[in-house]
Design a protein with these regions (language model features):
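Cytosolic regulatory regions of ion transport systems
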Residues: 1-203
Length: 203
């Protein structure tokens, strides 16, 4: 696949390296040339300096042949504009956008964005969305820590995340709702069929 990544922070650099190692053609765009140091010496993709909504720069990046674009800068406004340019101007088939402010979720949804929030696990989620067309929902376990996928039934619907954390003695780090993933506030009220990603210690 030919993939453009806009933003070379922690998520962007991790995503770029992961996709590049799997054999995909990767172009990374960032306004700060120093950000490319995060990619390391083994990155064999292309880097371009500039913003992700500059049409000429995007054409130089090869957006007209891109299979997917991941927009992962550190600003929601920049991400929205860059996403709309990729989708509306260049008709990129897959565009995945990072979200920081969960309060904007409804706006992002109305714009038709594929939004993902958070930090560490986000790059892997974006990679799965780009390469396989869906978000990962797998259980995993590392040492004493395990990640649990927990589906909300009607008995738990209406509770806040804080109340559920107390019940389960675990840490909720993401909520999947209508195939969108974001990092919510603890006072968020869950709905039936929400899926929680929970970090828990092995007992």
């Amino acid at each position: 696949m030919y993939i453009i990544i806009i933003g070379c922070g922690r998520v962007g650099s991790q995503l770029a390296n992961s996709l590049s190692m799997e054999g995909h053609n990767v172009v990374v765009i960032d306004e700060n040339s120093r950000a490319f140091k995060r990619l390391g010496a083994n990155f064999n993709g292309t880097t371009l300096i500039g913003n992700g909504y500059d049409k000429e720069l995007l054409q130089e990046a090869g957006i007209e042949k891109a299979d997917a674009v991941a927009v992962v800068t550190n600003g929601d406004n920049t991400n929205v504009v860059s996403t709309q340019v990729a989708r509306k101007v260049f008709n990129v088939p897959i565009v995945v956008t990072r979200i920081y402010d969960p309060k904007r979720e409804q706006l992002y949804r109305e714009l038709g964005l594929n939004v993902i929030g958070g930090t560490t696990v986000v790059a892997e989620m974006i990679k799965e969305k780009i390469t396989h067309g869906h978000f990962i929902h797998q259980l995993s376990e590392v040492g004493e820590i395990k990640i649990i996928e927990f589906k909300i039934d009607k008995n738990l619907a209406g509770l806040t995340l804080k109340e559920i954390e107390t019940k389960e003695q675990s840490k909720i780090f993401a909520v999947i709702r209508d195939k969108e993933i974001f990092f919510p506030e603890k006072e968020m009220i869950v709905k039936e069929k929400d899926i929680l990603l929970i970090v828990s210690k092995n007992r």
